[in-house]
Amino acid sequence: MPALKGKITVITGGSTGIGLATAKRFVKEGAYVFITGRRQAELDKAVAEIGRNVTAVQGDVSNLDDLDRLYKEVETKKGKLDVLFANAGIVEPKPTAAVSPEHYDKTFDVNARGVFFAVQKALPLMKDGGSIILSGSGVWQKGIPMYPTYGGTKAALRSFVRTWTAEFAGKGIRANVISPGPIETPILEGQFGENTDAMKERFKTMIPMGRIGKPEEVASAAVFLASDESSYITGIDLPVDGGVVAV
């Protein structure tokens, strides 16, 4: 039987990269997926690629009205929610001395505040329990220069999940983090531009498995944490990074 048969799922940041790969896998495993993204053209393309059992809702996770509209759509169409993959996020490398208040606020608004309220507003639809998955990163564990704000937001997500593990257990809701390493996505390209190939080669020297990951490999981990196969797993941070944070 498909791992997610009949499950109603939401994937924020579901129009490209890890989010899109996960949406495709969720549908393949029997789920109905609501995906979000800021750009309607990318959402339309994603829906065409996914092909079935998908609804796209344009919006920005840092905008609480957009989150309300998302969950209203879920409630109207399906009446419940089984899985939330809070995947939307941004990354803009900057050294501490170059971080402006605007950069700081934007990064935390999307990566931390947006995730927090995406979860809060999902709870009324998880009446029968469910699985919450946050998209984290090993950056906060490794202490990598140029990522003080991004790493800070991902550390916040780890803290959220520790709290929610205890807070939501009585409601049958599990909460976990997936922490991807360097993955072949538009975000990776966007960080380094014309230096992307050189940075990929540098990353490979830091990764014990010696290669950049694929979005589909993160999607496989998300399927596991979304499914009943992980029914006794909550509160973890699952690295999908080729061994980066382990050594």
What do the PLM-derived regions correspond to, one by one?
Residues 142, 223, 234-247:
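Short C-terminal tail/terminal secondary-structure segment
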Residues 119, 153, 161:
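Active-site helix of classical SDR
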Residues 99, 143-152, 163, 191:
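Active-site loop-to-helix junction immediately N-terminal to the catalytic Tyr of the SDR YXXXK motif
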Residues 124-125, 166-170, 231:
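Alpha-helical segment proximal to the catalytic Tyr-Lys
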Residues 8, 15-16:
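Conserved glycine-rich cofactor-binding loop
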Residues 95-96, 100-108, 199, 203:
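Substrate-binding pocket helix/loop in short-chain dehydrogenase/reductase
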Residues 85, 169, 174, 233-235:
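Short, small/polar-rich loop/turn modules that mediate ligand/substrate recognition or access, typified
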